[in-house]
Structures are given as C-alpha cells and as structure tokens.
Amino acid sequence: MKAVVELRQSYKLNVLLKVSGVRKATFFYTINKVDKDDKNEEIIKQIEEIYHQNKGRYGYRRILLELGNRGYRANHKKVKRIMSKLGIHGITPRGKYNSYKGDQNGTCKNLLLSKVVDERKHKTTYERDFSTTACNQKWTTDVSEFHIAAGKLYLSPILDMHNREIVSFNVSRSPNFAQTTDMLGKAFAKHGNLEGLILHSDQGWQYQMKFYHQELERRGIRQSMSRKGNCLDNSPMENFFGVMKNEMFYGHEYEFESLDELEKAIVAYIEYYNNERIMEKTKGLPPILYRQQSSNQLSC
C-alpha cells in the first residue's frame, strides 16, 4: 500500500493496483481513513490548546465556537467525545449565585418589565426585557463580595446588556459610595452621549443616593431598579458574577494570600473576559471585538 501511494504521481493508479494486487476499494478506504485520522489529530491538538489557553474554563460549547473561529469543522458530539478521551472538562457552575445586597428600599420603577394582560384567563404577568439592538441602550450594575482569609473585596461593575462587556468597574475593600461614583465616572469618561440609556440595578442603598440620581438625570440616563427581593430582574449582572466566580474564584480562594493578589486576579479576569472570552450571544466573539464589529455596521 505504501509503495502504491509513493508511486501514484508517476504511474497510473490502475497499473499500480494490478501489480500490487490491492483492490481499488481497499486503497481508497485506507487513504480516506488516513486523511480523517490526520484531521482528527489536528482537531485534538486544537481542542487541547483552546482548553489550556483559557485555563480550563471552556466547556465543549465554547471550544466548538472557537474551533469554528479557527476554521475547523466539527460537531458538538465529536468535541465532547474527544474531551472525554482527553480527560478534560469545563468548569461546572456552582449553585444559585447571589450578589452582595445591603439595605434595600427601592425608589425607582423597573423599566425592563413589560405588563402582559391575558383577558381570557383574567391574569396579569410581567415579562423582563433585556433585549437591545445596539450598545449603550441598557446597562446594569451591582456589587459582589469576594471573601478570602485575608479579608474581603467588593467588585462594582457596569455591564452593557448588548455585548455583555464590562464597561467600567471598581474594586474596593468596602462597598462605599466612593466606589460607585468612581465606577460611574469611568463609564461616563468612555462614552459621550448616553441620553436615553437605561441604567438598571437592584435596590441597593448606593443607587438611592441623591448624587447618583442627579448624575444620571444630568446625562439623560433613565434609572431602573429591580423589584425588591427579585434577583431575576437583574439576571444579566447576576449571571456575570456567577460565571466570573466559577471560573476564577471558587475552589481557588486559598490560593490568594493577600487582598492585593486577589485584586490583581479580578482585574486580570475582567481584561480576559472583555477581550478573549467568547460566548454564543456575541456570535462566538469576545465582547469588545463584537462591539467593534457591530460599530462598523453602525450597531453601536
């Protein structure tokens, strides 16, 4: 068989097969199998590379997306099978995530709710609307606590619901109002005209401060708040915190010997999340690249 392959460019295939006694069907089956094995070997190599480049954070869905970005064709069953053989798997999310809360006594309506009246059943329900058509239409914010032996850090970010980008953030050793104003200042410095934007939050005390209301009002930003005790009203932000903690914090708490180390890891993760971490919602692209491509199409 090897001789037939090597001499194929110099002699007619039918002659080589007749002399060697190899059947035509056998020859093509073997050639196709070798080609397939070579392709599988390359895909296996790519899967391992993607997995380790992302520190084991990707499961089969994101690995499949990234394979497509790199020009490789495969289906989810194949990727799952190869990952199983390699003994690698993505991070399994922990249970329901709850962000840091504080005193709550809401003062604003939830602008992300739509009232739905079913006259036939005499029933009224409310549907959440996180949909957008461009960046800077709907932002959301919240505060999350990171607790290690050395103490606590609090992360306060703003997330754009369109491309899931972290627009700005602040890491502090206490959840004070200076943290909130710093986060706002960074976001406003990045973007000029934000008139009409909805900025959503829970009913945390920070978002009820007079200065906070005034800063939003001055820029034509509409303030929105979740209903009391209803974390699903702010699920895009809650989901981000859950993903972040599953990927860089849970199970690694004891690796951080100081708050400075933890803060560096938080900053590094957000940089990674914005610039490298792909997701299905953003068509297999990281948030910032998705925004840039959308911007070119006049979407952001």
Positions of the model-derived regions?
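Short, flexible loop/turn motifs enriched in small residues
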Residues: 10-13, 134, 148-154
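Basic, flexible linker segments flanking DNA-binding modules
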Residues: 1, 24-133, 230, 286-295
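Residue-centric detector for conserved, function-critical "anchor" positions
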Residues: 1-10, 15, 37
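RNase H-like two-metal-ion nuclease catalytic core shared by retroviral integrases
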Residues: 99-103, 201-203, 209-212, 223-245, ...
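C-terminal domain-tail junction helix/linker
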Residues: 217-221, 243-300
